[in-house]
Amino acid sequence: MDLVKLALEIGFSHAAPLNASALRALPEVREMCASGRCRRYGSSWSCPPACGSLEECQGRMRAYTGGVLVQTTAELADDFDYESMSKAQEVHKKNFFTLARQTRLLIPDCLPLTAGSCTICRSCTCPDRPCRFPNKMLSSMEAYGLLVSAVCEASGLPYYYGPGTLTYSACILTKEG
């Protein structure tokens, strides 16, 4: 299955084979989650600490040998063009959910890691009740301790596409090179 081709057909701006051997769960990335910058730490099943310890996340990633890295790049009118930023995030999330769903049908043993926390449910049940959709839930690359810029570099895609742009990145790990 050519996941790069599928990703581009779905509408991602960029896609490349994922260098899974370069994935490293870093404590400093997880510490950014714990600092509460996105306000999802401890309140989403897809985020730390509910998504597992750094060691557990690294162990899950180690089981995979390949995959695809995908990106959505938007042009911004200026540094405060929140409308374009929000639209790009919405498009990226929608496209990634489609890619994850299709990949899970084709390759059931895969690990999708999105940009930002899971947004399948309007309100997460964490920590009071179990996840409503554990088979659809999407953790983020950052929740798994990944420094996104390093993953992009190791996989041959830029992280930054120049002034006036914003790029969202996500990946799907597979056991197929």
Predicted region positions:
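TRNA-binding/sensing appendages of the translation machinery
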Residues: 1-19
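Catalytic cores of enzyme domains
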Residues: 13-44, 48-177
